Amino acid sequence: LQEKVFSIIGLGAEAAREAGIAVAHVEAGLRSRNNAMPEEYNRIETDKISSFLFTTEPDAEKNLRDEGVSGKIYPVGNVMIDTLIRFLPIAEKSTVMERLGVKSGTFALITLHRAENVDANLGIALKTIKNSLQGVMKVVFPIHPRTRDAIIKKWGERDFGVWCDRLHIVEPLGYVDFLSLMKNAKVVLTDSGGIQEETTALGVPCLTLRNETERPITVEMGTNEIVGLDATKIRESLKRIVNGTWKHGTVPELWDGHAAERIADILIAA
């Protein structure tokens, strides 16, 4: 390093430690308990070497204390929700729903990209989603390039076109357009971690297509439920959502749009 650096946030943690630079980990302490996920190893190892551990929820703080980390723990909130709050007024001006021919509160928004669904269970995942939502509500599925490639590799270009028709698959969207869809969806079905948090902040029902979550506060306080690829759970959840009996959820403490400011204040004062 040619310049003197006070701390490294996130990427480059191991190299920073070797260079004697303090590491600050944003979203520290999140644990899925699924050691097959590469992210799980990265989270644990980064927390071990971090001097500043910035957490988004109480479970993360408990995980860090249970693991006996040496760094100092700071509950600061969620920087992803900072971004959501900042861009929401812009997203409200998006024309994406008009372009896709859907109306607010009438469609399901789908995202699917994790290895456990795309590499190992792609056919099951797509059929479960299609069969669960068919005749219930419209679907919008901005497809991840990894998922697109997996469908084409498994079934070919022709069948990819068939899936596009069945699931209203569209090209990947920018953040503002996607945020507009997420805010206006009747329900979001996803295997993304961040979307679990964003839907809780927006008060939109979320069905997580995984068997675990590293963000349990979205289930305990928010609008999220873990359903995996269980068709029965998905259909029962959709029925509650359509009937208006889904839990309302509350926004966790400190998810107020000021997490980044708290982090900056802590680092400046250190």
Regions found by a protein language model. Give the residues of each.
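Conserved C-terminal portion of the radical SAM core fold
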Residues: 144
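Nucleotide-activated sugar donor-binding and catalytic core shared by glycosyltransferases
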Residues: 1-139, 147-270
